Regions:
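A Zn2+-metalloprotease active-site environment signal
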Residues: 8-257
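Sec-dependent bacterial lipoprotein signal peptides
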Residues: 1-8
Length: 257
């Protein structure tokens, strides 16, 4: 119990307490291993215009994220981030951001994001998962579930191997990339809210988020990957509508440098 309490941390974006039993450096090593293995087999899109769109929006979201953390004295949270933006030739409606800022977008989701604003909804959301250390939190929860509190201390003494093994499960980078251990409702709410903040600070219109998630919900069986681990459509859209008025203060013209 003392070990678990000592490992409690606070989400830098929202102040929520979270349990982190895996160090940032260890998580980064494990996630980069999974990412590099995936990118060796993934087929990058040959569509120059679409690729440029992903890079363009991704860079603006990344810059806004960095600015938000700088303004709030949390620059250290991104010290190991090296942003990369990839568009993969795959018809799935999916995207993800690995720890360290490795962003992957599937061509399929561009069908649902016709404008840069729409794509910013997706990328803002996924970046939050990485910055808020949601993957670390899931891995920590799995360590507790796998080993139990009684032998957790002994397990952690050998957790390099355990971390690599859990990374394969948590990140799920393979034929079903993105179908990972589901983020909790808390994680999704954080990603939805802070994703809106980041995209707004980047100069995008957060109001399009409602339309994007409505299109996702109308996709039915064709979009199970992203929706399967997220809250119900009605719950998400209702929450986003509640968040939108607050986004006004994050618009670039309203922020003080």
């Amino acid at each position: 119990m003392l070990l678990v309490v000592a490992a409690c941390s606070v989400v830098p974006l929202t102040g929520r307490r979270q349990m982190l039993l895996v160090s940032d450096s260890e998580l980064l090593t494990a996630s980069l291993s999974q990412y590099n293995a995936y990118m060796k087999t993934a087929v990058k899109s040959s569509d120059k215009a679409k690729t440029e769109k992903v890079v363009r929006v991704g860079r603006r979201i990344a810059a806004a994220t960095e600015e938000y953390l700088r303004q709030n004295g949390m620059e250290s949270e991104l010290q190991n981030f090296r942003w990369e933006f990839n568009l993969i030739k795959d018809k799935q409606h999916n995207a993800f951001c690995m720890p360290g800022g490795k962003i992957v977008v599937y061509e399929g989701i561009l069908d649902l994001t016709p404008t840069d604003d729409d794509l910013a909804v997706v990328l803002g959301h996924e970046v939050v998962h990485a910055v808020a250390k949601h993957s670390n939190e899931r891995m920590s929860q799995q360590l507790v579930a796998q080993y139990g509190a009684a032998i957790l201390s002994a397990a952690l003494s050998k957790k390099s191997a355990a971390t690599q093994q859990l990374a394969s499960t948590v990140f799920g980078l393979g034929t079903q990339v993105g179908v990972m251990l589901p983020f909790s409702r808390k994680h999704e709410s954080e990603a939805d809210y802070m994703g809106l903040v980041f995209m707004t600070m980047a100069g995008y219109n957060p109001n399009v988020a409602v339309g994007f998630w409505q299109r996702m919900s109308q996709g039915g069986s064709s979009v199970p990957e992203l929706l399967s681990t997220h809250p119900s459509d009605e719950t998400r859209i209702a929450a986003i509508r509640r968040y939108l008025p607050e986004m006004e203060k994050y618009k670039p013209r309203n922020r003080k440098n």
